[in-house]
Amino acid sequence: FTWTVISKATVFAPEKQEGICSICGAKQSRDNGSKLTATMKLNVTSIKLQKKQSTTKVKVTGLANGDSVKSWTSSNKKIVTVDKNGKIKAGKKTGSAKITITLKSGKKATLKVKVQSAKVKTTKITGLKTKLTLKKGKSLTLKPVISPITSQEKVTYTTSNKKVATVTSKGVITAKKKGTATITVKSGSKSKKLRSQ
């Protein structure tokens, strides 16, 4: 028999193989190995929201083949609600609730949500290099990581020398001529500086 894979393993079934007899041409199928273990990862385990604020920034990744998100549920709908696509919305009250994400395989993950009266402020800015080297005419987009992901404070970009490097409101740096410029990335009271040369 010569065996070939006809379907890959999923969380519900092992790999399926089909075999063909090289002499008589008869076909046979078999399972190979076992079904996959359900896995999932959340990009955060807890979030803060201001009253009436909503977010779609909570992401589920790392699912095993064949698995998918079945439901998002809230432990207290007066505090926070969530729709089938994972859009989380704070209500009019402050307090805490838990969001449970359930996969079709049955695996679950929990996200803690705290609803507050105050605006959600930026606590840190990461994901940026301190130095950038760009050739004249070349551009690069900055991708700062703002914590918490639900911060309501806008990200702004400024340059110390527009003749050397410009930066747009979307964080696109363009080198204009040889020299050094300081790019400042700011969100609320937090800021990060990087040198472009």
Q: Where in the sequence are the language-model features?
A:
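Short functional micro-motifs and their immediate structural scaffolds
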Residues: 29
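Short recognition patches in nucleic-acid-associated and regulatory proteins
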Residues: 1-10
